[in-house]
């Protein structure tokens, strides 16, 4: 398929480029995308939550009152889950929430996401984006014609000036094509991809 190449500096189309049908014309596989995105979000969980059971709560070794004759319900410890300050009945413990996603599933999900972004006109190809120095104002000026509320810019190589310029714009993110995740592709309203990054996608996902 063909995709227009846009110039941010001139705010116009500079030509057309041929995209790989293997990567950019796949059907929308929602169950697979859901599984991969869920795995990414699960792996991001710290899993450090911890609560104390009745045996771990400090104190409570002595029986609070005698078994019979008080009229109260019997109790053997003040750290029972029924008591204020007691341990939790089903205490949360640190755990690993990561899920396995093999390479074949990941590549298929990425192809499906990229194809759907192209169909929805949420992925646009730009010729290049370069800044001579880190300046937020310069980057904001380049992106001013873009109507998306949030923009993900995918580049082939790390650009320190570009990253520093976008750091103070909360709705803009810069990602290297090798580090972009399915979650980020879905989360942003639109994705700008350089020509070199498009070729990297085609090489890595075929």
From Swiss-Prot:
The keyword Membrane does not apply. Coiled coil: none annotated. Pfam families: Ribosomal_L4. It comes from the Bacteria. GO terms for biological process: translation. Keywords: Ribonucleoprotein, Ribosomal protein, RNA-binding, rRNA-binding. InterPro entries: Ribosomal_uL4, Ribosomal_uL4-like, Ribosomal_uL4_dom_sf. The keyword Ribonucleoprotein applies. Residues 48-78 are annotated as: Disordered. GO terms for molecular function: rRNA binding; structural constituent of ribosome. GO terms for cellular component: ribonucleoprotein complex; ribosome. Belongs to the universal ribosomal protein uL4 family. Part of the 50S ribosomal subunit. PANTHER family: 50S RIBOSOMAL PROTEIN L4, LARGE RIBOSOMAL SUBUNIT PROTEIN UL4M. One of the primary rRNA binding proteins, this protein initially binds near the 5'-end of the 23S rRNA. It is important during the early stages of 50S assembly. It makes multiple contacts with different domains of the 23S rRNA in the assembled 50S subunit and ribosome. This is Large ribosomal subunit protein uL4. It comes from Nitrosococcus oceani (strain ATCC 19707 / BCRC 17464 / JCM 30415 / NCIMB 11848 / C-107). The lineage of its organism: Bacteria, Pseudomonadati, Pseudomonadota, Gammaproteobacteria, Chromatiales.
């Amino acid at each position: 398929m063909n995709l227009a190449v846009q110039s941010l500096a001139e705010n116009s189309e500079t030509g057309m480029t041929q995209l790989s049908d293997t990567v950019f014309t796949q059907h929308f596989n929602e169950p697979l995308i859901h599984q991969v995105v869920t795995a990414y979000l699960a792996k991001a969980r710290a899993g450090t939550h911890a609560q104390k059971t009745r045996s771990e709560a400090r104190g409570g070794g002595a029986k609070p009152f005698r078994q019979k004759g008080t009229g109260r319900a019997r109790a053997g410890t003040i750290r029972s889950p029924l008591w204020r300050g007691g341990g939790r009945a089903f205490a949360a413990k640190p755990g690993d929430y990561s899920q396995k996603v093999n390479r074949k599933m990941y590549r298929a999900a990425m192809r499906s996401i990229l194809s759907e972004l192209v169909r929805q006109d949420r992925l646009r190809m730009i010729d290049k984006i370069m800044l001579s120095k880190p300046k937020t104002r310069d980057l904001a000026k380049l992106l001013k014609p873009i109507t998306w509320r949030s923009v993900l810019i995918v580049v082939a190589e790390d650009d320190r000036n570009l990253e520093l310029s976008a750091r103070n714009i909360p709705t803009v993110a810069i990602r290297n094509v090798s580090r972009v995740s399915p979650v980020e592709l879905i989360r942003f309203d639109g994705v700008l991809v350089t020509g070199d990054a498009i070729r990297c996608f085609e090489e890595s996902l075929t």
